[in-house]
From Swiss-Prot:
This is Glycine--tRNA ligase alpha subunit. Tetramer of two alpha and two beta subunits. It comes from the Bacteria. GO terms for cellular component: cytosol. It is found in: Cytoplasm. Its EC number is 6.1.1.14. It is an enzyme of class 6 (ligase). It comes from Streptococcus pneumoniae (strain ATCC 700669 / Spain 23F-1). NCBIfam families: glyQ (TIGR00388), PRK09348.1 (NF006827). It catalyses: tRNA(Gly) + glycine + ATP = glycyl-tRNA(Gly) + AMP + diphosphate.
Amino acid sequence: MSKKLTFQEIILTLQQFWNDQGCMLMQAYDNEKGAGTMSPYTFLRAIGPEPWNAAYVEPSRRPADGRYGENPNRLYQHHQFQVVMKPSPSNIQELYLESLEKLGINPLEHDIRFVEDNWENPSTGSAGLGWEVWLDGMEITQFTYFQQVGGLATSPVTAEVTYGLERLASYIQEVDSVYDIEWADGVKYGEIFIQPEYEHSKYSFEISDQEMLLENFDKFEKEAGRALEEGLVHPAYDYVLKCSHTFNLLDARGAVSVTERAGYIARIRNLARVVAKTFVAERKRLGYPLLDEETRVKLLAEDAE
């Protein structure tokens, strides 16, 4: 019987595979976020005309999902392996299935289904056509073709593939609890993450200072606006991410009502839309440096008309 891949070997295998497909291997973005989609390597790069192919691991924090380390499959923080390709390759689904084969999962021997599940992120004004990928009855991946990001229509279309690494590893290693996943030889997932899970859950549900978080949200929102007034897209987006995480902490604490919740989401969305528009304008001002010369000259000429 062959040795099962460790968590980090799964990551290395996916990195090598998508590197071979022409993706840049980015590093996790150093700001709290609820999903890999919110990284600027996806959110910003999915808009505008320039090509972009990237893959990266993204730790994703969802305070309301914390369970004190007591639930075998629900986590405050989980890991996503994010792949974004723009324009979307025509064979992206075939490439995905090939990536599973590299992990030792033969599509001919397993029940792999693409279940329609169109995607939407109201807090960033983003949406797309999507599918959940189910492997023998368990969701392991979200597949999305972005139609709108930051309130802007995407052209060309970006394909996003988001692997749920904990679920994938649980399946490959045949364990029922994420905490039993072998991260590396001789080191279990729980030995690294169960204490942080407990502490972050306790903080999110019991300890966080609601008044401070409310004040911080207002300050982060204001600072994002100040950065945008100066045309500073990336610092502004950092504060949008901070607003989002702060809201998630408030939500986990039960500090916002249903009515207030919609208002906070709208405030984040409005900022994200301005960031998106400003980013596209910035790339145009820079002359769309990632485009090939012929396309770049043609597009700039059209924009000038």
